[in-house]
């Protein structure tokens, strides 16, 4: 048996929309597919979790063990990517002790807050990165492995750390491989903000050279 769903099987899952050349592992877990849109040339590997309101553009690779919790919305624009074991949260519970924690409790006993997470074009997120809700990772930014992203990230920058901080500018040479006319404008994508319960987080992997150079 093929490790990825066939085109016919993907159609039967019931996605809001799905493009061409999409490969999704049979070992991935898809919840609320009616709220998930996927573009062209996308690959989603083993043991990924996709839940909630998620918009995935085209030419995107989501590596193994990545979790996208889109209760309040997650948008991944074209040519972005996430490395293994990263998590993106669009909503989080209140850990102050004033409320119960988790989606199993009545709505009046929890305090969930968050907002849409937008991952712009050409963003690369390293392994074991945690992305908090209600932020934008700017076009072309790179996030080093094991980082915590809790604020907006400047475009075309290399970032790492807990919390993540800008290390230096990122080169744009990769653009020579892209025909600008082939890029989609996703700035008008609308993500409805509704949520009931649950907590969330996200991440991807960039070369460990970032850490090594910083230590040099």
Per-range role (PLM):
Residues 118, 128-141, 147-150:
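Beta-rich strand-turn-strand
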Residues 156-179:
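Conserved beta-strand-loop-alpha-helix hinge in the C-terminal portion
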Residues 125, 143-145, 159-160:
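Short, well-structured beta-strand-loop connectors
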Residues 182-216:
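Intrinsic low-complexity, glycine/proline- and repeat-rich
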Residues 86, 93, 136, 147-148, ...:
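Flexible glycine-rich beta->alpha loop in the catalytic core of nucleotide-sugar glycosyltransferases
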Residues 2-7, 26-38, 43-133, 162, ...:
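Flexible, glycine/small-residue-enriched loop-and-beta-strand segment within the central core
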